[in-house]
Amino acid sequence: LICTAKQQVPVGQGEMFFELENDPMAIPPIIEQLMSDLAHRGWDDELAQMRLSLALQEALSNALYHGNLEVSSSMMTESTDPFYQLAERRRLVQPYSNRMIQLVAKHENERVLYIIEDQGPGFDFTKLPDPTHEENIERFNGRGLFLIRNVMDEVTFHAPGNRIQMVMHKPPSLDDPDYLQGLVA
């Protein structure tokens, strides 16, 4: 397996920088490495790791497909084939082929911070449709960002809409006597 991601580590204590090409196969190994690093830092809560993995998968996929490759989710109707076929064609041609995704990961004791930036034109994050409204239930657009907002503690978009910052605070441990005392009180 050829991983099309460049890594420069460490930037600082608990900080990593990745630069990914427009290859969806580069995403899972990066997420796996980040989750492994978190586990070594005591973030062994499986639910938290699952939530973080989901948010990272969605954010990196959005940066790849909607950001760098500029493929609209409106192309997903009954079939996703046209969406992925266009993405595959664009991966190989200018200006899309030279665009990169940058990921900064800061793993701290009590929180994690991820900043993901693509080189696409961005989008108007203030006009995202609510995927839970009845008229949007069967549409694909907005679902990934909805998931990200619901699994992360803080989500911030930066103009022009090609950069997302996500934060999760470390969940309390069931082994923590102070946390257990709070449950009993």
Where are the regions that the model predicts?
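Conserved polar catalytic motif of the HATPase_c/GHKL fold
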Residues: E58, N62
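Conserved beta-strand-loop-beta-strand hairpin that lines the nucleotide-binding pocket
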Residues: V9-E15, L64-A185
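Conserved short strand/loop->alpha-helix "switch" segment adjacent to the catalytic nucleotide/phosphoryl-transfer site
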Residues: M35-Q57, M76-T77, T132, I137-R139
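Helix-loop-beta hinge of the Bergerat
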Residues: M16-D45, E117, P121, F125
